[in-house]
């Protein structure tokens, strides 16, 4: 019997992405401490948090197949997460203006019953346009990207902030790498293309 698919996230963006695959799924709030550890790299951080989210989800769904995802950006060698407010969003976008920024998304798929864990990091690179302070403020006020790593929504007006995007899956930038997820699901016997 196929275990129930659970998204360990309350993100409406991740839920909307997962719905694209046409699979029935539930969701839960993983409620974990997302603080980085001392000297932890961005890749290690998102991998650890994605795994932790699946394990937290498994406490609610002990027979589930749990999906966990986490994302950060790196600007000038510093890990950047969600801005949480207008001031921080403007600061993040000002720092990113004219630069090439890499986003790292950790994706984990955990079979709670068997203990099998598959976790990987998917990078995605963004080339920001040179942005004026007025453009940044106008964007932040229009889209209020306070709960998005890097302070933008690439699926919306945020696309106007960029010169170029580089990566295997544009969904990665929104927070859930669907190409990688479909590969992981296939390894669990779930083919999203099957009848």
Curated annotation (Swiss-Prot):
Per UniProt, the keywords (alphabetical) are: Cytoplasm, Hydrolase, Nucleotide metabolism
From the UniProt record, list the reaction(s) this protein catalyses: N(7)-methyl-GTP + H2O = N(7)-methyl-GMP + diphosphate + H(+)
Q: What class of enzyme is it?
A: hydrolase
Q: Which cofactor(s) does the record list?
A: a divalent metal cation
Active site: residue positions: 70
Q: What is the first-listed, main subcellular location in coarse terms?
A: cytoplasm
Marked site: Important for substrate specificity: 13, 71, 155
Q: What is its EC number?
A: 3.6.1.-
Q: Name one Pfam family in it.
A: Maf
Which Gene Ontology cellular component annotation is one that this UniProt entry carries?
cytoplasm
Please describe what this protein does: Nucleoside triphosphate pyrophosphatase that hydrolyzes 7-methyl-GTP (m(7)GTP). May have a dual role in cell division arrest and in preventing the incorporation of modified nucleotides into cellular nucleic acids.
PANTHER family, per the entry: 7-METHYL-GTP PYROPHOSPHATASE (PTHR43213:SF10), BIFUNCTIONAL DTTP/UTP PYROPHOSPHATASE/METHYLTRANSFERASE PROTEIN-RELATED (PTHR43213)
Protein name, as recorded: 7-methyl-GTP pyrophosphatase
Question: Lineage of this protein's species?
Answer: Bacteria, Pseudomonadati, Pseudomonadota, Gammaproteobacteria, Alteromonadales
